[in-house]
């Protein structure tokens, strides 16, 4: 029950954007989701998350900087890792990508008329959102990761908000996997 409550609680973050979407009669496609080539979108997401994890988590662990990219979680049972992937994709990835790379990015892009402005503002919001879970350095790094996700969606073929929520979830989950295995 606690695990389900954690996911449902995280979904509350997306409540206001979801209400605005419903009131405006917007569709998920208005926020970067697509019905086309869903299999490719999933593969792109897995690749983005895996590459990010290798570059930003595994390599730092292997060269002695693991404590700087540590989630603080230590799992030893398979069910814990399975839940971590599920939670990171269907709570964190889904909510944060819908809100920041879907809703906020698209609303700013419509108002400003330029991708770059939407990338910068949505990424700054993403960084600020993460301020309370870390420090100023983490906030800046998270904003950079947000900008990277925006650029992926804009520049990579078959990269949608679905791809990003999967990539984000895989990246976050692999932080715990690598920390549990290597620290």
Regions found by a protein language model. Give the residues of each.
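Hydrophobic alpha-helical transmembrane segments
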Residues: 7, 42-47, 82, 116-121, ...
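Alpha-helical transmembrane segments in multi-pass membrane proteins
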Residues: 1-25
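Membrane-embedded alpha-helical segments of multi-pass membrane proteins
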Residues: 7-16, 82-86, 140-148
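Membrane-interface helix caps and helix-loop-helix hairpins in membrane proteins
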Residues: 128-137
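Juxtamembrane helix-loop-helix connectors linking adjacent transmembrane helices
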Residues: 1-4, 26-92, 110
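Function-critical hydrophobic alpha-helical transmembrane segments in multi-pass membrane proteins
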Residues: 72-128
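Functionally important transmembrane alpha-helices
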Residues: 138-183
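Membrane-helix interface segments
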Residues: 37-39, 78-81, 111-117, 135-136, ...
